[in-house]
């Protein structure tokens, strides 16, 4: 007798049911695999972020994170003052004690020689501007006095141009303000650059001394002076953290400075004697 393929033999075991897994079991495996994949990806991302962060040891200082300096609001409040005066403010930035001199309602000009420091009637604020060369005692860098060029050169890339009542502080190899000053009877001088567009400018000068800077701060021209000897790098960084947009150096150390305070009292700084450099220059604010 011919056997049927559906007949069950004595030695056979046949399982009755579907040969493939149920749909629910398939979806369960898919969901589990997806969850595992997501977990692996999340772990990789977290590890990469952790690896990219700077590892700071217990004896190291974390990276410097500057915060807005509280004097920024104070500078803006001076707009209400209409008198011709010099307002000062003492503060500390990055552990550097310093003083801000803010001349109000005045435009500076340049002077050469010591005559201006004896005029304590009209002058309100003055500081030495350009450096004097040690070899021939001439002015260092380009210098224009009331439209007349007294010196040429690009030993320092920082500059200050005074055209009419507009004061411009900047950093550049060549500035059109030099030519413009010669054409319209303006002023121009060069110094070490400290801050350019809110960024610190490095200089080769590494010594420490009292530092002074001519700065642009919230639309105003201010002079900043340290009370302690500082490197040019630390001084520049403090000016950046203070919020200055642009800044150049003014002669520091024992150089001559003078201002009339809000009470009308004249206060001198630096060494006023002996007066030996005929080409000494000053930036002066007068009534």
Protein language model annotation of sequence segments:
Residues 2-152:
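Zymogen propeptides
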Residues 89, 159, 213:
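Short, surface-exposed charged micro-motifs
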Residues 93-98, 162-166, 216-222:
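Beta-strand-turn-beta hairpins that frame and shape the catalytic cleft
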Residues 127-128, 133-199:
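Active-site-adjacent helix-turn-beta-strand microarchitecture at beta-sheet edges
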Residues 137-154, 207, 216, 220-245, ...:
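Conserved, well-ordered active-site substructure
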Residues 185-224:
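Flexible, glycine-rich surface segments
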């Amino acid at each position: 007798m011919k056997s049927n393929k559906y007949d069950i033999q004595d030695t056979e075991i046949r399982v009755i049911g579907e040969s493939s897994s149920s749909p629910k079991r398939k979806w369960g495996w898919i969901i589990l695999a997806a969850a595992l994949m997501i977990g692996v990806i999340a772990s990789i991302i977290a590890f990469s972020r952790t690896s990219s962060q700077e590892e700071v040891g217990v004896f190291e200082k974390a990276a410097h994170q500057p915060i807005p300096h509280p004097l920024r609001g104070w500078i803006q409040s001076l707009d209400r003052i209409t008198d011709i005066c010099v307002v000062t403010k003492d503060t500390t930035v990055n552990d550097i004690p310093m003083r801000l001199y803010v001349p109000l309602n005045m435009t500076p000009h340049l002077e050469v020689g010591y005559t201006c420091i004896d005029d304590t009637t009209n002058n309100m604020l003055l500081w030495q501007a350009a450096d004097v060369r040690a070899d021939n005692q001439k002015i260092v860098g380009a210098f224009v006095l009331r439209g007349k060029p007294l010196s040429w050169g690009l030993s320092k890339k920082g500059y200050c141009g005074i055209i009419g009542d507009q004061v411009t502080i900047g950093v550049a190899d060549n500035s059109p303000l030099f030519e413009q000053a010669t054409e319209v009877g303006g002023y121009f001088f060069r110094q070490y650059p400290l801050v350019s567009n809110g960024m610190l400018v490095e200089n080769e000068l590494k010594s420490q001394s009292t530092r002074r800077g001519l700065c642009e701060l919230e639309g105003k021209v201010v002079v900043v002076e340290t009370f302690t000897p500082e490197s040019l790098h630390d001084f520049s960084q403090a000016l950046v953290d203070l919020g200055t947009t642009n800044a150049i150096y003014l002669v520091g150390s024992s150089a001559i400075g003078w201002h009339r305070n809000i009470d009308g009292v004249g206060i001198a700084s630096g060494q006023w004697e002996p007066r030996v450099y005929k080409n000494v220059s000053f930036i002066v604010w007068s009534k």
